[in-house]
A protein has these predicted regions:
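Small/aliphatic-rich secondary-structure junction motif
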Residues: 3-55, 77, 83
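Conserved beta-strand positions in the Rossmann-like core of class I SAM-dependent methyltransferases
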Residues: 34, 86, 141
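Short, hinge-like loop/turn segments at secondary-structure boundaries
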Residues: 50-54, 104-105, 128-129
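A short acidic, glycine-rich active-site loop
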Residues: 54-69
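Structural beta-alpha unit
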Residues: 73-110
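Glycine-rich, Arg-bearing micro-motifs that act as flexible, cationic patches
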Residues: 109-134
Length: 144
């Protein structure tokens, strides 16, 4: 039923619960999982011009390293359980990148945590899970 499942990971407890749920589905349906972490493009807007380009570059590099670590931990968990896995580190607007990855990877299901961003950021950017669930071309499962 679900041969390929995309899981959005941001390191939050909610995204880890989503991963646990996706693992159960993968075991049941012998699915491959695609783990996706998105480094938010909005970080560029946070960095004031007077701070310099190098400071912004360092912040993005650190966020990318954090993302790689989140993906590596998820990949290790899945490989230990014999579940086929691929990882993707994206940069941009999280909902848009998750939707793009779902199409590019031809997934049958997207699994996301119900929350990940702080409430303040969610107010300004909107809920990633809400945007993905409304615009995805495949079923979306939101885990609480």
């Amino acid at each position: 039923m679900f041969s390929k499942i995309l899981v959005g990971l941001d390191g939050s407890d909610f995204s880890l619960k989503a991963l646990e749920f996706a693992i159960d589905l993968a075991k049941k349906y012998q699915s491959q999982l695609v783990l996706v972490h998105v480094v938010m493009r909005q970080i560029y807007a946070i960095n004031p011009p007077e701070a310099g380009v190098l400071a912004g570059t360092a912040i993005v590099r650190e966020l990318e390293e954090d993302g790689k670590a989140i993906l590596a931990k998820g990949e290790e968990t899945l490989k230990a359980q014999g579940i086929p896995v691929e990882t993707r580190l994206k940069q941009g607007v999280p909902a848009e990148e998750l939707l793009r990855a779902a199409v590019d990877e031809k997934v049958d299901l997207i699994v996301l945590g119900s929350r990940g961003l702080s409430q303040v950021r969610a107010f300004f950017l909107g809920s990633v899970s809400d945007k993905v669930s409304h615009h995805a071309k495949c079923p979306t499962l939101i885990v609480r």
